[in-house]
């Protein structure tokens, strides 16, 4: 009997994400996928995907109630891969401000999630991104590849500098809707996208395949 060589990915189910869409996309990319909030399963998986839709404050509340904040922190402390999508990326920053109300995020990266600075909000539809050289997340993708966005809030400024030359600075990918905003981050074991790779056709499939390939 042959043992499966597929990487095990948990889609963390805390009530605020397109978990079924993510499950199908990851399975098509070759992963063994489970949707769960079970602590041990989430901790032991090769990769943990944290989706997110809706309000920053509601997502943070749901994540904490499911102990997801602790799971993410412990996985990253051990160098275990985590990927956030949409609001699942936003909550990795210091804070979010919605309608003047500030909510603390997971504080993995400095920065504030605020309203998009654009004439048309939400930003809904397909857009290109500007990925940095050396990106593993966007490997094999053309510069004109388009990804699907749907959001009203974003991070417009990146302020994390790495003073230690022995440490690799995070790779930040940008997109523009009115004003440039952070579209993706690659930071050691922690990767995240503002767009929805599971809804981004062939480009999104390649991106998820790239992530799974690093697990």
From Swiss-Prot:
GO terms for molecular function: glutaminase activity; imidazoleglycerol-phosphate synthase activity; lyase activity. The active site is at 86 (nucleophile), 196, 198. The keyword Amino-acid biosynthesis applies. InterPro entries: Class_I_gatase-like, GATASE, Imidazole-glycPsynth_HisH. Its EC number is 4.3.2.10, 3.5.1.2. GO terms for biological process: L-histidine biosynthetic process. The keyword Amino-acid biosynthesis applies. Pfam families: GATase (PF00117). Residues 8-215 form the Glutamine amidotransferase type-1 domain. SUPFAM superfamilies: Class I glutamine amidotransferase-like. Pathway: Amino-acid biosynthesis; L-histidine biosynthesis; L-histidine from 5-phospho-alpha-D-ribose 1-diphosphate: step 5/9. Its main location: cytoplasm. It is found in: Cytoplasm. Heterodimer of HisH and HisF. NCBIfam families: IMP_synth_hisH. This is Imidazole glycerol phosphate synthase subunit HisH. It comes from Streptomyces avermitilis (strain ATCC 31267 / DSM 46492 / JCM 5070 / NBRC 14893 / NCIMB 12804 / NRRL 8165 / MA-4680). The gene is hisH.
């Amino acid at each position: 009997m042959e043992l499966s060589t597929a990487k095990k990915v948990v889609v963390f189910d805390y009530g605020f994400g397109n978990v079924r869409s993510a499950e199908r996309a990851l399975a098509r990319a070759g992963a063994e996928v489970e949707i769960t909030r079970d602590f041990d399963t989430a901790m032991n998986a090769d990769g943990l995907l944290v989706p997110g839709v809706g309000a920053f404050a509601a997502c943070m509340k749901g994540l904490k109630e499911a102990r997801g904040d602790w799971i993410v922190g412990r996985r990253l402390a051990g160098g275990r891969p985590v990927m956030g999508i949409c609001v699942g990326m936003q909550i990795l920053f210091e804070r979010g401000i919605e309608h003047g109300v500030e909510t603390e995020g997971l504080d993995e990266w400095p920065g504030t999630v605020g309203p998009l600075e654009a004439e048309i909000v939400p930003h809904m539809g397909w857009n290109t991104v500007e990925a940095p050289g050396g990106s593993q997340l966007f490997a094999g993708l053309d510069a004109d590849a388009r990804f699907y966005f749907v959001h009203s809030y974003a991070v417009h400024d990146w302020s994390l500098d790495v003073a230690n030359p022995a440490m690799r600075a995070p790779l930040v990918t940008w997109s523009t809707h009115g004003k440039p905003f952070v579209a993706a981050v690659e930071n050691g074991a922690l990767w995240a996208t503002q767009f929805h790779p599971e809804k981004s056709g062939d480009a999104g499939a390649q991106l998820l395949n790239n992530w799974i390939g690093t697990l």
